[in-house]
């Protein structure tokens, strides 16, 4: 973190490094105030043991416990405990369920793939209240293993019972890395996406479930995910947070502006923008095939980008958003380009705020949930990495550089963001941590 004396117009000359140091203290529930998704793995009892880790054979009484030769699962850290506790609060689940774009797209995806779910065995990774597990049971699943480490699993079991589905939906309170399921599964479903797609690192548990239990040729929903980025102009945000200090009830408080910039723009901001804020076509940062991605690939993601500004405007930072696609085993994701949608139903944004959106024309088309600025709003919104000071860009001006997203070494659920960008002969670096 910079001291006030070193801060000059947001940059040291033309190459200013804006650093945010990792918190070296222990976690607290407030550390996960941004968390909007369910936990995916199992909570460690504060006394040191794993809480409520179940074997399916013990619960069903159908199979004898199987000994495994797998390597030991990763330890459950204090950060994990705090993360799991944050998902025991009903408010997080209420917000997710009330997100109609999210919940209705998942239900539609389940029904679209009903022929692959009916009579099959399903695992719901990070089941939360159990709503997706119940959707799968309603679609005719033979059995659904609903796995969650948070104490919300206790309520999920009651929800399942109240809906008369206890014979089909088995709630397992524990980490995916620790619980035992003594059979292979046909389908994995999970709403694992965090802000900026990879925040919270929940995808790792989906990969673990896939490698432990999914049959060859099985179905994973969603099947693919793509993270995008684009430069933006957002003068209203800057005016509201920074220019406000120029005149406060007739008092010159401009001395507050440098501190205000640090406080407002030091960390990534989760907020909603519109297509009118976007200066160029988006670029792909990372495309994920959930059937093939390896856990090691999530440690660090680096992408280079090159944008051509399509208008003259102040550039205030970069916006990030994602799409996820629900394709069946025989489907292929649509080709990724910076100027076309990733799949039918997703959208690409023009700098004028217009949207190229392809609707699904038949049931075999891939279903897409998009969090782009021009798609229906979701609780994910968009993630913005703001500059401390805007950069004026001209029409057709090139903006290029690279972005690296990496898991914090101390707490993998936090995400380090290293952003390099240059334009008109000036180069900059912005570093921050998404907590």
UniProtKB/Swiss-Prot annotation:
Gene3D superfamilies: Hnrnp arginine n-methyltransferase1, Vaccinia Virus protein VP39
Enzyme class: transferase
InterPro entries according to UniProt: Arg_MeTrfase, PRMT_dom, SAM-dependent_MTases_sf
A GO molecular function held by the record: protein-arginine N-methyltransferase activity
Bias (Basic and acidic residues): 12-25
Binding positions for S-adenosyl-L-methionine per the UniProt entry: 93, 102, 126, 148, 177
Disordered: annotated segments: 1-48, 333-377
Every SAM-dependent MTase PRMT-type domain range: 80-418
Gene Ontology BP annotations: methylation
Keyword vocabulary terms for this entry: Methyltransferase, S-adenosyl-L-methionine, Transferase
Pfam families tied to this protein: PrmA (PF06325), PRMT_C (PF22528)
Compositionally biased residues, Low complexity: 337-354
Recorded coiled-coil stretches: none
Reported function: Arginine methyltransferase that can both catalyze the formation of omega-N monomethylarginine (MMA) and asymmetrical dimethylarginine (aDMA).
Name the UniProt record assigns to this protein: Probable protein arginine N-methyltransferase 6
Species annotation: Arabidopsis thaliana
Highest classification ranks of the organism: Eukaryota, Viridiplantae, Streptophyta, Embryophyta, Tracheophyta
């Amino acid at each position: 973190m910079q001291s006030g004396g070193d801060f000059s117009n947001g940059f040291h000359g033309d190459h200013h490094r804006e650093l945010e140091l990792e918190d070296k203290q222990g976690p607290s529930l407030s550390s996960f105030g941004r968390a909007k998704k369910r936990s995916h793995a199992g909570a460690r009892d504060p006394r040191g043991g794993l809480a409520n880790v179940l074997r399916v054979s013990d619960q069903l009484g159908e199979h004898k416990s199987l000994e495994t030769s797998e390597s030991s699962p990763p330890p459950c850290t204090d950060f994990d405990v705090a993360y799991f506790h944050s998902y025991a609060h009903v408010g997080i689940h209420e917000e997710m369920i009330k997100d109609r774009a999210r919940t209705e797209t998942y239900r539609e995806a389940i029904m679209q793939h009903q022929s692959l779910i009916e009579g099959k065995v399903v695992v719901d990774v990070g089941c939360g209240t159990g709503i997706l597990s119940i959707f799968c049971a309603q679609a005719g699943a033979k059995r659904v293993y609903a796995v969650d480490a948070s104490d919300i699993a206790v309520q999920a079991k009651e929800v399942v019972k109240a809906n008369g589905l206890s014979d089909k939906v088995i709630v397992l309170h524990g980490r995916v890395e620790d619980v035992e399921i003594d059979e292979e599964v046909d389908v994995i479903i999970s709403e694992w996406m965090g802000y900026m797609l990879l925040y919270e690192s929940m995808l790792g548990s989906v990969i673990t479930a896939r490698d432990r239990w999914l049959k060859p040729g099985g179905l994973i929903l969603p099947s693919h995910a793509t993270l995008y980025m684009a430069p933006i102009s957002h003068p209203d945000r800057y005016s509201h947070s920074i220019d406000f200090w120029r005149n406060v009830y007739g008092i010159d408080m401009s001395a507050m502006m440098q501190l205000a910039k640090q406080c407002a723009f030091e960390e990534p901001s989760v907020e909603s923008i519109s297509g009118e804020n976007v200066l160029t076509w988006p670029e792909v940062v990372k495309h994920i095939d959930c059937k093939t991605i390896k856990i090691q690939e999530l440690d660090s993601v680096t992408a280079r980008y090159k944008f051509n500004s399509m208008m003259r405007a102040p550039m205030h930072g970069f916006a990030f958003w994602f799409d996820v696609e629900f394709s069946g085993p025989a489907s292929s994701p649509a080709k990724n380009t910076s100027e076309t949608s990733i799949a039918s139903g997703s959208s690409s944004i023009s700098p004028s705020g217009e949207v190229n959106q392809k609707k699904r024309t038949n049931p075999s088309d891939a279903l897409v949930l998009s969090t782009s600025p021009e798609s229906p709003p979701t609780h994910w919104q968009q993630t913005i990495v703001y500059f401390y000071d805007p950069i004026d860009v001209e029409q057709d001006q090139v903006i290029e550089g690279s972005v690296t997203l990496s898991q914090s070494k101390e707490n993998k659920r936090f995400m380090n963001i290293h952003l390099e960008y240059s334009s008109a002969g000036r180069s900059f670096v912005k570093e921050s941590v998404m907590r």
